[in-house]
UniProtKB/Swiss-Prot annotation:
The lineage of its organism: Bacteria, Pseudomonadati, Pseudomonadota, Betaproteobacteria, Burkholderiales. FMN binds at residues 62-67, 77-78, 83-84, 141-142, 185, 195. This is Pyridoxine/pyridoxamine 5'-phosphate oxidase. GO terms for biological process: pyridoxine biosynthetic process. InterPro entries: Pyridox_Oxase, Pyridox_Oxase_CS, Pyridox_Oxase_N, Pyridoxamine_oxidase_dimer_C, Split_barrel_FMN-bd. Belongs to the pyridoxamine 5'-phosphate oxidase family. Keywords: Flavoprotein, FMN, Oxidoreductase, Pyridoxine biosynthesis. Homodimer. It catalyses: pyridoxamine 5'-phosphate + O2 + H2O = pyridoxal 5'-phosphate + H2O2 + NH4(+); pyridoxine 5'-phosphate + O2 = pyridoxal 5'-phosphate + H2O2. Its cofactor is FMN. Binds 1 FMN per subunit. Signal peptide: none annotated. Catalyzes the oxidation of either pyridoxine 5'-phosphate (PNP) or pyridoxamine 5'-phosphate (PMP) into pyridoxal 5'-phosphate (PLP). Disulfide bonds: none annotated.
Length: 213
């Protein structure tokens, strides 16, 4: 390890998170923080790390983009035959994490994952730029390929086949994580950070608790 890595430190002093000023509903708290991240013009505030676990118990992570958020859960779109798609098919639970560095904030979300409806996937697919729609056909995501030329050739082939109106591939669509646990982290001075955890109760409400940093 480079000797200077261990010496990198930062004092977190931009904000605070307390029970009196946080929402009782975690979705409302998340939407408030997401709105602030958007207004701050952070780079890709919609980016989130998705963690899944394979049938062999090996975890994996990757960055995906949130495409929807409501009382039903958090939505993103992907290739169902990718590694994450196959892992979610075998073990339909996942964790998401947003890290808004400039705001010194992290949000973690856990829950069960399901596919969104075909209607939802079709609507979002149609909203994408043409190149992105063709790319969903051209890329055999997570498979080994000989070179980038394979992707370029595939894109040209599907472009000639579908022209300006490619249908949604049957292997491509959305997932929705239905949260049963949220955690909000706000960096604080002296490493005495604020952490609030929301756990869904059998009644449908949420238990809010403070965790030690």
């Amino acid at each position: 390890m480079r000797p200077d890595i261990a010496d990198l430190r930062k004092s977190y002093e931009q904000g605070e998170l307390d029970e009196a000023h946080s929402a009782a509903d975690p979705l409302q708290q998340f939407e408030q923080w997401l709105d602030q991240a958007l207004k701050a013009k952070l780079p890709e505030p919609n980016a989130m790390t998705l963690a899944t676990v394979g049938a062999d118990g090996r975890p994996s992570t990757r960055v995906v983009l949130i495409k929807g958020c409501d009382a039903r859960g958090i939505v993103w779109y992907t290739n169902y035959e990718s590694r994450k798609g196959r892992e979610l098919a075998a073990h339909p639970f996942a964790a998401l994490q947003f890290h808004w560095v400039d705001l010194e904030r992290v949000v973690r979300i856990e829950g069960r994952v399901e596919k969104v409806s075909d209607t939802e996937s079709d609507a979002y697919y149609r909203s994408r730029p043409l190149d992105s729609r063709l790319g969903a056909w051209a890329s055999p995501q997570s498979q080994v390929i000989a070179s980038r030329a394979v992707l370029v050739a595939n894109a040209a082939k599907v472009g000639a086949q579908f022209l300006l109106n490619p249908p949604r591939p049957p292997h491509w669509g959305g997932f929705r994580l239905r949260p049963d646990r949220w955690e909000f982290w706000q960096g604080r001075k002296s490493r005495l950070h604020d952490r609030l955890r929301y756990t869904q109760q059998p009644t449908g409400g949420w238990l809010r608790e403070r965790l030690a940093p």
